[in-house]
UniProtKB/Swiss-Prot annotation, chain A:
E.C. number(s) listed in UniProt: 4.2.1.33
The keyword Secreted is assigned to this record: no
Name of this chain's protein: 3-isopropylmalate dehydratase small subunit
Gene that encodes the chain: leuD
Keyword terms, alphabetized: Amino-acid biosynthesis, Branched-chain amino acid biosynthesis, Leucine biosynthesis, Lyase
Organism, as annotated: Nitrosomonas eutropha (strain DSM 101675 / C91 / Nm57)
Metabolic or biological pathway: Amino-acid biosynthesis; L-leucine biosynthesis; L-leucine from 3-methyl-2-oxobutanoate: step 2/4
Any single Pfam family the record assigns to this protein: Aconitase_C
Enzyme class: lyase
Oligomer and partners: Heterodimer of LeuC and LeuD.
GO CC terms, sorted: 3-isopropylmalate dehydratase complex
Entries under HAMAP family matching the protein: LeuD_type1
Function summary: Catalyzes the isomerization between 2-isopropylmalate and 3-isopropylmalate, via the formation of 2-isopropylmaleate.
GO terms of biological process kind: L-leucine biosynthetic process
Length: 212, 470
């Protein structure tokens, strides 16, 4: 996994609650057996006026001028600010893949769906929970101030506006450690291989029917 | 003093990284269910890292999302879908993993076949790269959906790095009215607590209305726990659980069976267990439910009306409702029973088991679908459900009524195969999600129980199944 460095970037607002993973990356793109290339179909049904299909050249498609991410001021945005329960629905990791492939490195919301939140950390995309009134302000500023940026410091667990206002966020210690160092979680678990084997032997003795 | 969740969690902790009870632990996984959509990248990375599956006998694989529900003799026509299904088979062959292929009668929706085979047993941790893995919690399992990186993690280590959830008890006491099903309980709960109500929690369902449900009904309920935001839903073991499992292919036999049952009987919350949250519903108050919006929490009763956003004071909620009504093409104040339909879908990991098909068949028996219904389809959850239904003559009842009788798979629940809604089409669906575009771009989904979907097919619009003439 890629290390999460300190980051400063343009903020794109998506003022809507309960954005589900079907909206983030529609199911027809889930037929791919690859991990990359989902960015061009991020929010496909909102972003384009025509129906998207795998293999369709994005350059030939009709952009929806009313969709906020299509506005020129949000091009190159690295930070998405959105509403409650972002990423609800299916467990598809294709959703964080698509967000990351599009260029987002940080998603800020008052709350996230559990599986989505968990999936983000596995690929080095940072989901940040901030209180609703703070998110209100960030969305308002991103809508009104041209080129509005935020600076994210994972080490210090802060989100800083260029005006100097700083908001602290919580993140699990282990997840932070993995992100900051770009660690391979599987490798970390395999350091406990002996413990896993021992656990498994006990389990086999106590509940042999689980090993039929 | 322990909850069922505590017992399941504690029994699977291999190693705790710290003394913090809310810290990350290494959690052992007993059963890994695998399907074609969320596994190819996991297998690919596993191989690129020079690793192998830790315990192949814990894995059961099946292709369900992409498979056609029409004639399968010539395979899958869409080359991208075909490649994904073939990739699953190649991975399973390479590592000698048990897979039920498309021509195997045991093939079906992963959350139907696990329990059907007895591959889901009480006390297990069950994971799958699919959010509806919560279904298996009906068997007093700790079962939850994971992403592809975690699929790879479980393949490589038989474990996950996880953090304990909070607990929520949802208690439903009393007697369910005639025509009211597990699906209606699930939607009523989501209507009450919202789609984020269970976020960060594992839900245990309890109370005599839950005890009165069959295993099929309990699976429907736990299946929808994720739509309430909870990764896991679960129900303690009782005779209903044990009777369902007995004799299934992967279930223990003879001495081992007795030993297992003795242990399984302990898998329920202690009388004095403490939960972080408790939600109580009275079964008598639950009526047949119909969703009207683009989130499962946008739900009302069959005698209800489409809400008016003008009545909502919270601006974000109001905005969401306006957006949903526009997408759904519905006017505020419309009686639910006046909503006319184009298509009917009976199927999905929520409602495609034999009991669901029986309930729907009972409604349509001797009747015809309404002329405005362009397509009504029944997609059994597995080949075995299909053949049992055929033995009972249900296929003939459905077909005589004008329904199509299909091959098993996820089908129009998420429309990854050819079964989909066209833009603007309105569907009464027994599936679990009414998100925008879920059943096809521009499609409009109303979630209901199987008997409500069947009654809607006959009437051409929603109708109260409690007063529907048999």
């Amino acid at each position: 996994m890629k290390k999460f460095e300190q980051l400063r970037g343009i903020v794109a607002p998506l003022d809507r609650a309960n954005i589900d993973t079907d909206a983030i990356i529609p199911k027809q793109f889930l037929k791919s057996i690859k991990r990359s290339g989902f960015g061009q179909n991020l929010f496909d049904e909102w972003r384009y006026l025509d129906y998207g299909e795998p293999g369709k050249d994005a350059a030939s498609r009709q952009l929806n001028p009313d969709f906020i991410l299509n506005q020129s001021r949000y091009q190159g945005a690295k930070i998405l600010v959105t509403r409650d329960n972002f990423g609800c629905g299916s467990s598809r990791e294709h959703a964080p893949w698509a967000l990351q492939d599009y260029g987002f490195a940080v998603i800020i919301a008052p709350s996230f769906a559990d599986i989505f939140y968990n999936n983000c950390f596995k690929i080095g995309l940072l989901p940040i929970v901030l209180e609703s009134p703070v998110v209100d302000r960030l969305i308002r500023d991103a809508l009104t101030v041209d080129g509005y940026q935020l600076e994210i410091n994972l080490e210090a667990q802060t989100v800083m506006a260029l005006s100097g206002e700083t908001y602290w966020f919580e993140v699990d210690h282990f997840r932070k450690h993995c992100l900051l160092n770009g660690l391979d979680e599987i490798g970390l678990t395999l350091q406990h291989a002996d413990r896993i084997r021992k656990f498994e032997i006990n389990r086999r003795n106590e509940q042999p029917w689980l090993f039929l | 003093m322990k909850t069922l969740y505590d017992k399941l969690w504690n029994g699977h902790v291999v190693h705790a990284e710290s003394d913090d009870p809310n810290g990350m632990v290494i959690l052992y996984i007993d059963r890994h269910l695998v399907h074609e959509v969320t596994s190819p990248q996991a297998f690919e990375n596993l191989k690129l890292s020079g690793r192998r599956p830790w315990r192949t006998d814990s894995i059961l694989a099946v292709a369900d999302h992409n498979v056609p529900t029409t004639d399968r003799s010539s395979g899958i026509s869409d080359p991208i879908s075909r490649l994904q299904v073939e990739t699953l088979s190649q991975n399973c062959e390479e590592f000698a993993i048990t897979e039920f292929k498309m021509d195997d009668e045991r093939q079906g929706i992963v959350h139907v076949i696990g329990p059907e085979q007895g591959a889901t047993l009480p006390g297990m941790t069950v994971v799958c790269g699919d959010s509806h893995t919560s279904t298996h919690g009906a068997f007093a399992c700790l079962a939850f959906g994971i992403g592809t990186s975690e699929v790879e993690h479980v393949l490589a280590t038989q474990c996950l790095v996880a953090r304990k959830s909070k607990t929520m008890l949802v208690k439903v006491e009393g007697n369910l009215g005639q025509g009211v099903t597990a699906k209606d309980i699930a939607l009523a709960i989501i209507g009450e607590i919202g789609t984020a109500g269970g976020t960060g929690h594992a839900i245990e369902f309890a109370g005599n209305a839950i005890r009165s449900l069959s295993m099929e009904g309990r699976m429907t309920l736990c299946n929808m726990a994720i739509e309430a935001g909870a990764r896991a839903g679960m129900i303690g073991v009782d005779d209903v659980t044990i009777n369902y499992i007995k004799g299934r292919p992967f279930a223990p036999r003879k001495d081992l069976w007795d030993r297992a049952v003795t242990y399984w009987r302990t898998l329920k919350s202690d009388e004095d267990a403490v939960f972080d949250h408790i939600v109580e519903l009275k079964a008598e108050n639950i009526k047949p439910q119909v969703t009207w919006g683009t989130s499962p929490e946008m739900v009302t009763t069959i005698d209800g009306y489409v809400p008016d956003p003008a009545d909502i004071s919270d601006p974000i909620k109001r905005h969401n409702i306006e957006h949903a009504l526009e997408y759904m093409g519905l006017k505020p104040g419309t009686p639910i029973q006046d909503i006319a339909l184009d298509k009917i879908f009976i199927g999905s990991c929520t409602n495609s088991r034999i009991e669901d098909l029986r309930a729907a068949a009972e409604i349509v028996k001797g009747k015809r679908i309404a002329p405005n219904i362009k397509l009504a389809m029944v997609v059994p959850g597995s080949g075995l459900v299909k053949s049992m239904a055929e033995t009972e003559g249900l296929d003939r009842i459905f077909q005589a009524a004008g329904f199509e009788w299909r091959e098993p798979g996820c089908s129009m629940c998420l429309a990854m195969n050819d079964d989909k809604l066209l833009p603007g089409e309105r569907c009464a669906s027994t599936s679990n999600r009414n998100f925008e575009g879920r059943q096809g771009p521009g499609g409009r989904t109303h979630l209901v129980s199987p008997s409500m979907a069947a009654a809607a097919a006959i009437s051409g619009h929603f109708v109260d199944v409690r007063s529907f003439a048999h």
